[in-house]
């Protein structure tokens, strides 16, 4: 079946046009296109058309913690949020450190069929930081794993990290680092600063992140490797990234929506929903992260979507499991923090939420131009809509959103994966 998207503005630019999708590709773009007899018509008058979003950092919890999320519910949240591809992190149970697990995740994602679920392979066996996994076997498997990370913990041994970068370079795959020097964060649950001191919470210094980013930039330089920094959170990290890029080092970085919008003032409530790793930092850090995303020092937005069940969050702050939902709220938070103040345009949104992450992960069919003949991985956005976040109404199996009851701008009105409508008007299209 073909799909006709009526009255849309590609990249939010120019006059309204119709876009005809047929056989998984963009077939025609132009004003007042004829409606094919079998076409599914989407009235998107005045809406913005973007390439489907790509999330380099999600936690879908399958296998092992399906009570908090699974690939089906996570895929639904992703499609409703405008995503056509997501990367599922390796800290599952069992850990995704072998083709048995990574291929399962890939096949399950294909079975659900709402987004392309790309498994992230572990860098070290069991995330223990001691022995490299068989990255080559995972890359050669059905999932063709192209990114590896011990996210949740840092590959803190510099020799292991150096060997991982060298191994990855030979395979043409990417190492994504959770930048946290663990000896600086023992017992830490909040950003090290006045707020943590006032609340009596153990502090997590910026240097724990900055020191690993600096170290890994140098290791990547010497190995001739690519390295990707997960969830940058500190202003000092921005300065290190800028220095490394100026040196020609192949380093990329992501920022989460929650680090763009929120800061550690929220911790005053002691609500476990606000506990996340790395922690919410000071308002000045959020300002620096927004500017870095606008300037291209930070390359992309990634959600770090991390579902947790109620019993894991509704406890005292230090005992709460770290992490927040992000897939369905990501676009709206980026619009509020970046588009509304004029830091990014809609074309820039395509760059940081689709094109750059697809390029970083080397996905050939995602983040493509909105042109005839290109794959129809598409997101339609109503830029003028507003909505109120209610965790219980989100598609995720968990409800741990830090944006509960917030009014946010912009809604995803349709998502298409290879020409198939996966989500429309807030509902999944199976």
Swiss-Prot record:
The active site is at residue 304. GO terms for molecular function: allantoinase activity; dihydroorotase activity; zinc ion binding. Signal peptide: none annotated. Substrate binds at residues 59-61, 91, 277, 308, 322-323. Gene3D superfamilies: Metal-dependent hydrolases, Urease, subunit C, domain 1. CDD domains: DHOase_IIa. Its EC number is 3.5.2.3. Keywords: Hydrolase, Metal-binding, Pyrimidine biosynthesis, Zinc. It catalyses: (S)-dihydroorotate + H2O = N-carbamoyl-L-aspartate + H(+). One of its GO terms (biological process) is 'de novo' UMP biosynthetic process. Pfam families: Amidohydro_1 (PF01979). Zn(2+) 2 binds at residues 151, 178, 231. Pathway: Pyrimidine metabolism; UMP biosynthesis via de novo pathway; (S)-dihydroorotate from bicarbonate: step 3/3. Its cofactor is Zn(2+). Zn(2+) 1 binds at residues 57, 59, 151, 304. InterPro entries: Amidohydro-rel (IPR006680), DHOase (IPR004722), DHOase/Allantoinase_Hydrolase (IPR050138), Dihydroorotase_CS (IPR002195), Metal-dep_hydrolase_composite (IPR011059), Metal_Hydrolase (IPR032466). Binds 2 Zn(2+) ions per subunit. PROSITE patterns: DIHYDROOROTASE_2. One of its GO terms (cellular component) is cytoplasm. Belongs to the metallo-dependent hydrolases superfamily. DHOase family. Class I DHOase subfamily. Catalyzes the reversible cyclization of carbamoyl aspartate to dihydroorotate. This is Dihydroorotase. It comes from Mycobacterium tuberculosis (strain CDC 1551 / Oshkosh). The lineage of its organism: Bacteria, Bacillati, Actinomycetota, Actinomycetes, Mycobacteriales.
């Amino acid at each position: 079946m073909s799909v006709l998207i009526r009255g849309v503005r590609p990249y939010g630019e120019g006059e309204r046009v119709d876009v005809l999708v047929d056989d998984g590709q963009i077939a025609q773009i132009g004003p007042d296109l004829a409606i094919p007899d079998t076409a599914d018509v989407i009235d998107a008058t005045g809406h913005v058309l973007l390439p489907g979003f790509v999330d380099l950092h999600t936690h879908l919890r399958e296998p092992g913690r399906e009570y908090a999320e699974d690939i089906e519910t996570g895929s639904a949240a992703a499609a409703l949020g405008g995503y056509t591809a997501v990367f599922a992190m390796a800290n599952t149970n069992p850990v995704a450190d072998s083709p048995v697990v990574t291929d399962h995740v890939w096949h399950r994602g294909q079975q659900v069929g709402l987004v392309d679920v790309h498994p992230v392979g572990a860098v070290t066996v069991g995330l223990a930081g001691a022995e490299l996994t068989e990255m080559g076997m995972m890359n050669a498997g059905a999932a063709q794993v192209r990114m590896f990370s011990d996210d949740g913990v840092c590959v803190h041994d510099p020799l292991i990290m150096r060997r991982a970068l060298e191994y990855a370079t030979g395979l043409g795959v990417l190492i994504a680092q959770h930048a946290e020097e663990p000896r600086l964060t023992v017992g830490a649950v909040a950003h090290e600063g006045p707020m943590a001191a006032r609340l009596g919470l153990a502090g997590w210094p910026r240097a724990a992140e900055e020191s690993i980013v600096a170290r890994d930039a140098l290791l990547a330089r010497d190995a001739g490797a690519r390295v990707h920094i997960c969830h940058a959170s500190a202003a000092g990290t921005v300065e290190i990234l800028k220095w490394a890029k100026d040196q020609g080092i192949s380093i990329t970085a992501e920022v989460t929506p929650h680090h763009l919008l929120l800061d550690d003032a929220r911790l005053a409530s002691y609500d476990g929903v606000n506990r996340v790793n790395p922690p919410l930092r000071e308002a000045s850090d959020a300002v620096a992260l927004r500017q870095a995303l606008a300037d291209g020092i930070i390359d992309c937005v990634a959600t770090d979507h991390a579902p947790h069940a109620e019993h894991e969050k509704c406890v005292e702050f230090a005992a709460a499991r770290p992490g927040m939902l992000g897939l369905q709220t990501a676009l709206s938070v980026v619009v509020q923090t970046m588009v509304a103040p004029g830091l990014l345009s809609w074309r820039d949104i395509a760059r940081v939420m689709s094109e750059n992450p697809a390029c970083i992960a080397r996905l050939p069919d995602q983040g493509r131009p909105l042109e005839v003949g290109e794959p129809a991985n598409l997101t339609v956005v109503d830029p003028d809509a507003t909505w109120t976040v209610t965790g219980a109404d989100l598609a995720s199996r968990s409800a741990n959103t830090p944006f509960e009851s917030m009014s946010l701008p912009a809604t995803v009105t349709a998502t298409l994966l290879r020409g198939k409508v996966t989500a429309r008007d807030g509902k999944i299209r199976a």
